[in-house]
């Protein structure tokens, strides 16, 4: 057994444990994740179709091995599994994983959920996955660079990794924390810590250090009135990356 401490923030885990029962409530605390999920799936699907030979998003992702790092209650994991992929979802939250497993049973979707860190999984299954997704997770761990390294280890050469997180900017504080948490109450107060947000240049730098090439960096714009999300060129607040393993 490794004596290295786990790359886990227990306070962050506890926050999501407390609200795990709401994960699949479309009007609850996780409503923003449900609203953003179609855009994430579209972004991932389009890049898989463009970058992976022999794959057409219209025909599904059958036989593809995808791992969803920090899967929580399984919103993205289920969407990818419904497209035909063989999906593994990993998280360190017991209750979110229990919710994810139960919901998968209810919907008849087959997903391999595991309570394990990205680093531990990388030691167990290096170079196993065609695609790795790591959505809205990096800002919740003590060492995001370690997670990026683990994701690079998990993916096959030529495979794709998708990251999404929040930029460490004044605008992200104003919109993601002051507006979304404290004024509009779109997400629970205390969900995010601006000090843990990550500048795109920093994330891309870590990715390159671990053998990844960023092939797309797009901003995600949220309209609080309509609840819709769309991609744009501004990385000021939410952003999503597609990287390829060299």
Curated annotation (Swiss-Prot):
Residues the entry annotates as binding S-adenosyl-L-methionine: 40, 70, 91, 135
Biological process, per Gene Ontology: methylation
SUPFAM superfamilies: S-adenosyl-L-methionine-dependent methyltransferases (SSF53335)
GO molecular function: 2-polyprenyl-6-hydroxyphenol methylase activity; 3-demethylubiquinol 3-O-methyltransferase activity; polyprenyldihydroxybenzoate methyltransferase activity
Record has Transferase as a keyword: yes
Gene3D superfamilies xrefs: Vaccinia Virus protein VP39
EC number: 2.1.1.222, 2.1.1.64
UniProt cross-references to Pfam families, sorted A to Z: Methyltransf_23 (PF13489)
Catalytic class of the enzyme: transferase
Annotated InterPro entries: SAM-dependent_MTases_sf, UbiG_MeTrfase
Catalytic activity: a 3-demethylubiquinol + S-adenosyl-L-methionine = a ubiquinol + S-adenosyl-L-homocysteine + H(+); a 3-(all-trans-polyprenyl)benzene-1,2-diol + S-adenosyl-L-methionine = a 2-methoxy-6-(all-trans-polyprenyl)phenol + S-adenosyl-L-homocysteine + H(+)
Pathway this chain belongs to: Cofactor biosynthesis; ubiquinone biosynthesis
The entry's keywords: Methyltransferase, S-adenosyl-L-methionine, Transferase, Ubiquinone biosynthesis
Xref: NCBIfam families: UbiG
Function: O-methyltransferase that catalyzes the 2 O-methylation steps in the ubiquinone biosynthetic pathway.
Similarity field: Belongs to the methyltransferase superfamily. UbiG/COQ3 family.
Name used for this protein in its record: Ubiquinone biosynthesis O-methyltransferase
Source organism: Colwellia psychrerythraea (strain 34H / ATCC BAA-681)
Lineage: Bacteria, Pseudomonadati, Pseudomonadota, Gammaproteobacteria, Alteromonadales
